[in-house]
Amino acid sequence: MKIALDPYMFRRVPLTDLPALVADLGYSWIELSPRDDFMPFFLHPRADRAQVAAFSRALNAAGVRVASVLPLYRWSGPDSGERQAAVRYWKRAIQITADLGVDTMNSEFNGRPEAAAACEAQFWRSMEELLPVFEREGIRLVLEPHPDDFIEDGRAAVDLIRGIDKDWVSFLYCAPHTFHQGGDIEGIMKYAGPLLTQLHIADSFDHRASSGLRYIVNPPGSAARIHQHLDIGQGEVDWDVFFRTLTEVNFDGIATVCVFAWEERARESSAHNLEQIRHYLAKHGGTA
């Protein structure tokens, strides 16, 4: 298992200083999430060859590697122009990933729940254009359902991924989205089976609990989706079930700490979660 850090809470750290910081926190792997100076959210990548080369040198010097690159683009529309732009952005992001020597990219479906059928059609159109590019560059694609996306349910996401029918396209289970994707950690992981190749690890409260009043959102009846990315142990994800099931399905992929809630103590948070992962792996017979 590759235990990686999503360094989003450290996004203001210069890119070439990031690998040394990650190593100092005890991690050997990075999941490279969007940064304004490299691959921004929903915009064309900013990185040039010189920046990619400098980042590669910094990674080598720190003894840290990139496990996966995470871009977020509107490749499922529903706006056709946004979809076409997203495909262009994806092609550049794939090239940068290949230049970094990274073999995995992960992302979301990035559509809208109120236009699910139209967004799925746009998603398949993007797949027709991009699957050959992924395949040519030898890069794996890992997809996750997300709150407020056209696919939010874990099993439905597994079904769609299975329909892509490529052995290098697989499923990411995001722990802080547990209560939006069905609330069944064990069932979804086992349903995914060998398609489960990547994890996002953070805690969250169950928004459905206490008669739906764990959170109070105004105005009443709002369709807003609420979740957190907290430290392990601060929410209601059942971590014993989570790690026990990983052992049962022989998971040996990428496990990324993606806590966003504590920028004011980001170093302590990152170290704590690495320690907690090791604790639960030891408890349930897993390996890192």
Roles of regions detected by a PLM:
Residues L5, V22, I30, L59, ...:
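Conserved, mostly hydrophobic/aromatic
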Residues D6-F10, S33-R35, P71-R74, N110-R112, ...:
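Active-site beta-loop-alpha junctions enriched in small/polar residues
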Residues R12-V22, A85-Q95, Q181-M189, W239:
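Short, acidic/polar
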